[in-house]
């Protein structure tokens, strides 16, 4: 467990020692919490475990520049002309569709997979909380206003 981001040896031991002693996420976090291990740190570490985000992944990302693409979430229709300018002048590949990943390095594609997994996890929480349909990141339309 200590290979994951934000998981110290102390937290890893507490996780392993309390794996069978809880009924839900909130109760598990309460079992893990100490004066030194805050709720926020525990949440962040457990999220990194769920996402499979390891320290060596982040080290690899940072050693290779940290940023590998810019994902366009939406734009104003009256400013659509700026998209081609941004795409031409940007040092990073501009993603308008997730299927257009050929221009991204292998490391960048790994980072994108982590981003998509995080987005899908977020969507599953939203789906459950608000009883809405799940919106897969690959099928998410670009916002045009």
Segments predicted by a language model, with ranges:
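Non-catalytic terminal extensions that flank enzyme cores
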Residues: 1-145
């Amino acid at each position: 467990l200590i290979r994951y981001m934000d998981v110290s040896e102390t937290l890893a031991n507490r996780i392993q020692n309390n794996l069978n002693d809880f009924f839900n996420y909130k109760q598990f976090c309460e079992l893990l919490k100490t004066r030194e291990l805050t709720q926020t740190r525990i949440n962040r570490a457990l999220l990194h475990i769920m996402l499979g985000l390891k320290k060596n992944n982040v080290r690899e990302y940072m050693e290779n520049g940290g940023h590998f693409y810019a994902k366009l979430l939406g734009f104003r229709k009256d400013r659509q002309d700026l998209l081609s300018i941004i795409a031409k002048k940007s040092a990073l590949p501009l993603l308008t569709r997730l299927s257009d990943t050929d221009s991204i390095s292998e490391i960048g594609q790994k980072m994108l997979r982590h981003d998509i997994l995080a987005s899908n996890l977020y969507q599953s929480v939203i789906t459950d909380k608000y009883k809405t349909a799940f919106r897969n990141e690959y099928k998410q339309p670009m916002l045009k206003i």
